[in-house]
Amino acid sequence: MSRFFDAFEVYNKNKHAPADFKSHGGSSLNTGATTAYMFAREYRGPSTGEKKEAAAAALAADVKAGKVELVNDPNTADSSRKSSVSEEAMPQMVDISKLTREEFEALYNKINPGMLRKGEPNNKVNF
């Protein structure tokens, strides 16, 4: 009798399977031949140790690339190492509503070089 009600379930992997076949865990759709999808219930965030390792690796890569320099802070008693980001790597907050068109285009081209080629229409609507 319980097999009869299985046909009315919304999601049942074994709905159309033979009686002796049972799938145990996993997803039959993610076989590796196609794109594998991760659903929210399957996601497990990184542990604290993994986060620290990733942050240390990112800092080491930034130091190696020259984006960050490590300096000793004279204000602390133990003079621990702290990172100070160089001036060009720091994001700058700009109020674009107060910029002229030329200043905005110069700033935009500095941030996104090569986005618009010379003579290419920008497809913007002027109000």
From Swiss-Prot:
InterPro entries: Spg4
Record field: transmembrane: none
Region (Disordered): 71-94
Organism: Kluyveromyces lactis (strain ATCC 8585 / CBS 2359 / DSM 70799 / NBRC 1267 / NRRL Y-1140 / WM37)
Taxon lineage: Eukaryota, Fungi, Dikarya, Ascomycota, Saccharomycotina
Name the record gives this protein: Stationary phase protein 4
Protein family per UniProt: Belongs to the SPG4 family.
Pfam families from the UniProt entry: SPG4
Disulfide bridge partners, by residue number: none
Role this protein plays: Stationary phase-essential protein not required for growth on nonfermentable carbon sources.
